[in-house]
Amino acid sequence: MPEEMETQPAEVETFAFQAEIAQLMSLIINTFYSNKEIFLRELISNSSDALDKIRYESLTDPSKLDSGKELYIKIIPNKNEGTLTIIDTGIGMTKADLVNNLGTIAKSGTKAFMEALQAGADISMIGQFGVGFYSSYLVADRVTVHSKHNDDEQYVWESSAGGSFTVRPDSGEPLGRGTKIVLHVKEDLAEFMEEHKIKEIVKKHSQFIGYPIKLMVEKEREKELSDDEAEEEKKEEEDEKPKIEDVGEDEDEDKKDTKKKKKTIKEKYTEDEELNKTKPIWTRNADDITQDEYGDFYKSLTNDWEDHLAVKHFSVEGQLEFRALLFVPRRAPFDLFENKKRKNNIKLYVRRVFIMDNCEDLIPEYLNFIRGVVDSEDLPLNISREMLQQNKILKVIRKNLVKKCLELFEELAEDKENYKKYYEQFSKNLKLGIHEDSQNRAKLSELLRYHTSASGDEACSLKEYVSRMKENQKHIYYITGENRDQVANSSFVERVKKRGYEVVYMTEPIDEYVVQQMREYDGKTLVSVTKEGLELPEDEEEKKKREEDKVKFEGLCKVMKNILDNKVEKVVVSNRLVESPCCIVTAQYGWSANMERIMKAQALRDTSTMGYMAAKKHLEINPDHSIVETLRQKAEADKNDKAVKDLVILLYETALLSSGFTLDEPQVHASRIYRMIKLGLGIDEDEPIQVEEPASGDVPPLEGDADDASRMEEVD
């Protein structure tokens, strides 16, 4: 334990790590990871965030910087003591911050990161889950954090990761403001204290950090000694040597005087060397920047361990001037749609000065996966969040960013392989955009990809669907459901597919919201095959047959409606079924079965809407099916026949299930099925099966078992 802790034991407080954090630290310490170097990237990134915070606060209150004007990050390796120190002059942490942020309150990403690690994910993902600090234990067996916040005294946090940590007042060297992290580096990892290694890591991961990163380096220089110092040194040397008398000594001395030179010695000294002198990449000309430079900047900006998928670098000039650099990541973060998550990942700068990184009005929520920077020449430096909401300049910037993002997606769509990767990760965002962004709905609809009854394993665009439409086809047919197999085998698509029309398969819950907003595409109406009023092109003969069927089955429809009463709004003859006897369709503007399922699954649903949105069900019967034809004959013979009533209810409930609805009383339906099974097995409903209770613990043989056994012997 450090000396301060021994001299002031009363002031030392010990805390236990929250269980998930202790688990995570154990995982980090006890598992071998080859890329341990990412610890430095994470600590520098945290320092940069702390500097961002104090700079932002100082824009509205310059006195916040009285405790230290210069904003920088400093790295000090000390091989003699076996430590690596990272200092920043950021906002610092109060005692409560140290206790909460470094141990007792788990971040939302702690558990998710551990699960990802155990599933084989890369340790370098750690920063994306908000737990980057703990990567210190990849290289250190003890970590000490000194921190000073403007609103509190200076404190020290320390832990050797044994399940607990201590916090105490810091009586050591005052920091002014900021944080000093001292890593007590493991003996076998001394390379991380080497100057060349630190430079290599910073260049690789952090060269685009917006604050100076200084490394304390040890150098040598030659120092000239003055005549007096040289004489003194020479005298000391001569005093040590035995003196030998020489006859020609005086003559030699005269010669030496003429050749006397100033003596120099080598001395060691330390100085700070700035490691990231590169000017902000977004201010440079896009033609001069290589893909590798974009990749390095993206990784330093996002802490992502993978390369970006696409990049858009542009500037807008004229009445309004700003530059932007936008990236599409290769994969979606684990918490993309969490409410507590920041609404966007764009850093806002004003004339190269960082302002904020969670400006909600900068980009719409559906584009919250886009990473990058925007640097405005026109916004005031001391702008607050409240002022930004009203700012007209910001609205113009937002409009341009959306436009450029859509351009970027269109460019990406030209490369099928890359677009497939992008779509797998971010299709929900595009669909959310169709629901929320009416201005860009048409452009976003071009970016959608769906599997269809004719597309095989490849998803296709709506444009491709339209190009394959039959001559007499006026509508785009679609079906919503839980998965491809379910919708492909649905009774609703039977007739449509048989006629040779293509059906779009929409299998994500968000698709239900998409079709509510996107009523048409390229002048073609989107028509659900699960809703009433499905009209398929017909010739005169088909029309005539349909009219005849309506008349023929009118009586059965009335009987079925009377039996089902208010369970259905009406019973009609279907034009969409081929192999199934019946199906349940919904009203044109009501919920589909899939939407009803989604709404029932909402934890905070509004039950008042369930009634009027979900009630309008229509039962459609297939006039060409033998079950329906036989049922018609039975109903016409005796419409009060109990068997007809039972069969109609059973048909209705089965149709509910096959059409994607849930049953309100599944047990009653099960009882009906069991009754049908009994009938099939010839069991009389009225004869109860006698089961005698066994007298002892032994189970007696069932009635007839002995006979069965003897019969089995005969067979043998």
UniProtKB/Swiss-Prot annotation:
Superkingdom, taxonomy of origin: Eukaryota
Motif TPR repeat-binding per record, residues: 712-716
Keyword Phosphoprotein appears in the UniProt entry: yes
Positions that bind ATP: N46, D88, K107, F133, R385
Region (Disordered): 221-263, 688-716
Compartments, as annotated in UniProt: Cytoplasm
Signal peptide segment: none
Keyword Methyltransferase attached: no
InterPro entries registered for this protein in UniProt: HATPase_C_sf, Heat_shock_protein_90_CS, HSP90_C, Hsp90_fam, Hsp90_N, Ribosomal_Su5_D2-typ_SF
Pfam annotation, one family: HSP90
GO cellular component, one term: cytoplasm
Comp. bias intervals (Acidic residues): 225-239
GO terms of molecular function: ATP binding; ATP hydrolysis activity; ATP-dependent protein folding chaperone; unfolded protein binding
Record keywords, A-Z: ATP-binding, Chaperone, Cytoplasm, Nucleotide-binding, Phosphoprotein, Stress response
Assembly: Homodimer.
Protein purpose: Molecular chaperone that promotes the maturation, structural maintenance and proper regulation of specific target proteins involved for instance in cell cycle control and signal transduction. Undergoes a functional cycle that is linked to its ATPase activity. This cycle probably induces conformational changes in the client proteins, thereby causing their activation. Interacts dynamically with various co-chaperones that modulate its substrate recognition, ATPase cycle and chaperone function. Required for piRNA biogenesis by facilitating loading of piRNAs into PIWI proteins.
Entry text on domains: The TPR repeat-binding motif mediates interaction with TPR repeat-containing proteins. Interacts with shu.
Family stated for the protein in its record: Belongs to the heat shock protein 90 family.
PANTHER family per record: HEAT SHOCK PROTEIN 90 FAMILY MEMBER
Protein name, entry field: Heat shock protein 83
Gene designation per UniProt: Hsp83
